[in-house]
Amino acid sequence: MATLGDIGVAAAINILTAIIFLLAFAILRIQPFNDRVYFPKWYLKGIRSSPLHSGALVSKFVNVNLGSYLRFLNWMPAALKMPEPELIDHAGLDSAVYLRIYLIGLKIFVPIALLAWSILVPVNWTSHGLQLAKLRNVTSSDIDKLSISNIENGSDRFWTHLVMAYAFTFWTCYVLMKEYEKVAAMRLAFLQNEQRRPDQFTVLVRNVPADPDESISDSVEHFFLVNHPDHYLTHQVVYNANDLAALVEQKKSTQNWLDYYQLKYTRNQEHKPRIKTGFLGLWGKKVDAIDHYIAEIEKLNEQIMEERKKVKKDDTSVMPAAFVSFKTRWGAAVSAQTQQSSDPTEWLTEWAPEAREVFWSNLAIPYVSLTVRRLIMHIAFFFLTFFFMIPIAFVQSLASIEGIEKNAPFLKSIIENDLFKSVIQGFLPGIVLKLFLIFLPSILMVMSKFEGFVSLSSLERRAAFRYYIFNLINVFLGSVITGSAFEQLDSFLKQSAKEIPKTVGVAIPIKATFFITYIMVDGWAGIAGEILRLKPLIFFHIKNSLLVKTEKDREEAMNPGQINYHATEPRIQLYFLLGLVYAPVTPVLLPFIIIFFALAYLVFRHQIINVYNQEYESAARFWPDVHGRIISALIIAQILLMGLLSTKGAAQSTPFLLFLPIITFFFHRYCKGRYEPAFLRHPLKEAMVKDTLERAREPNFNLKPYLQKAYIHPVFKDNDYEDSRFDEISGYCIEDSDEECVTVPTKRQSRINTPAVSHASRGSSRSPPSK
């Protein structure tokens, strides 16, 4: 168990690591040859130009201005200088609201920490509960004297913790309500002021029913011309182009290798590069690399054209789904937010994501299989969570010197050294846990993709939800259980049964030391490592040396990245959970969390301004999830405090805590009804106002050309591929774009005397058979 000395060693290691990362960043960012790594967002906006194009030879690569080294920390005030409205214009509402999560952490925990340290810490410190606990052989450390563990059973001092629990709850709820109100207003204002985008006029229609007499495209056109005659404008059916997309990706990879060997040959024309054609180039016949890849690209071009023809001619490649666009935002809002058919499983509509946000491969998944896929992933996630208890138990064994000596007695002579003991107990458990979790976000994202979500934002939200549940069960509850009940097992066996609940009550707060070490590793050094961008830095210079030939190549090599919401938001929620749980129990943990929120806010604000380039904009659609998880953490903290006090003989004060979860739950229901609709539905009033203003400003704007190809699959947007079929089936009038489309007659036949024979697959005439 970590002592105050162990915590001090861990703090020194992590602070030193964070300082090294920040100093390295401050120096590397001002070097001209790293400019594209640390300021890629400004290059993508066309505002910043490369310093390598001007100046003396040395100054093109190394910053020789000594004054800039004296101002190496000026990135900190610069990161805080940009006001929020300008930040929204610069990076989008998603990025600005994401930063507000860190601000909420500061708003909640700074006042709570001041209150806890001024009231709870003196109350805990002046008690003598741990001296009595030693008589029952319960292990503890110096840091536990600052926690609730140091209060004697049945003491009236527990009333202080009860009052503080109410104060913490009311303050947290107040901050959450104000933030929910603020973010909801920001979202509505953002949507109202947003520039014209295709997704504002478009809905995604899924589970289009099969018709034996009409193709999917004709069915969609007929349905919306009949049911939305005044607002329907155009549509684009969805294709299963996954095989074609795979070929296009393969061609792109092959082209990169061709570029690499051509560049290599231009630098040294005395030797033509050669490769082996076998597996990974390890064996096989040696051939000319350039000729080989030129031949491969020609072969892939032929395969791509064949696959395109197949998609064009094969009606089975058309999925029962379509992107349907309307003449007005009002029409799209009505369609997206209403039931289209008496059968609630058909003609399912939802707001279309941005075209750049669509996860095209999942649109090819049959809608009827989504339920089965999600059931499979629920089961897989259960087993993933369950079996991960094994590494969690291993991590907790590292937090105990006794456990290490028992499992690895040959290390006893090494770990008995005071310095090694401090490093092992204060630093090693946190870093090992972080290493175990490093691939988890990617695994959860793969699971979300398998479930069939069709937008990047929905994929990230589902992965974030699962990551949050995983952290709650394994990282938090798993660490507490394996770190308290298991390590006190010997004590349990030697005492009477009625003493066991008291021992558990004293032991639970002891795990605060482990979480403190984890916060320092992940929240201090980890955040400082985020701003250094070591991996993108290395890969940029490798690509710049081996592959880059043009400015476009150099731009693609920048890799600005983005906020990985599915990985970062659950991590933030873990800190909310730890802070709310331990605020009335072990307040000494709160300063470590506050440092995390402050440092993370500074770092991510800098990254959002200068580095990240978001793939999509959801207008803060994720905020209800953020709010709900903080509420969940608050309720969990209240329940755990009740359980803890019930083992401490606080029979008089504990029942008063029963009201807290009830109050919190009804507060959540109030916020859900008051603010959440702004994130789920688009008001028709605002849609009509925006349509009216736009028509007044641009009365002659032709919306059809703007929308008609907005949602064509990216593999059909190549410059060398134009196909009139997509004009023909996209559902817009091609005779004259200024004329209104008229209702086309349905191709369905009467079922009274005619058998239901499909005519959609007939390649010849589409007219009804003669009688």
Swiss-Prot record:
* UniProt catalytic activity: Ca(2+)(in) = Ca(2+)(out)
Q: Which Pfam families match?
A: PHM7_cyt, RSN1_7TM, RSN1_TM
PTM comment: the record says:
Phosphorylated at Ser-54 by BIK1 in response to pathogen-associated molecular pattern (PAMP) perception, promoting its activation.
Membrane topology category: Multi-pass membrane protein
Q: Which GO terms describe its molecular function?
A: calcium channel activity; calcium-activated cation channel activity
- Annotated localization: Cell membrane
Note the superkingdom of the native organism: Eukaryota
Bias (Polar residues) occurs at 751-771
Function comment: Calcium-permeable channel that plays a key role in plant stomatal immunity. In response to pathogen-associated molecular pattern (PAMP) perception, phosphorylated and activated by BIK1, triggering rapid influx of calcium ions across the plasma membrane, leading to stomatal closure.
Q: Which family does it belong to?
A: Belongs to the CSC1 (TC 1.A.17) family.
Q: What is this protein called?
A: Hyperosmolality-gated Ca2+ permeable channel 1.3
Organism lineage reads as: Eukaryota, Viridiplantae, Streptophyta, Embryophyta, Tracheophyta
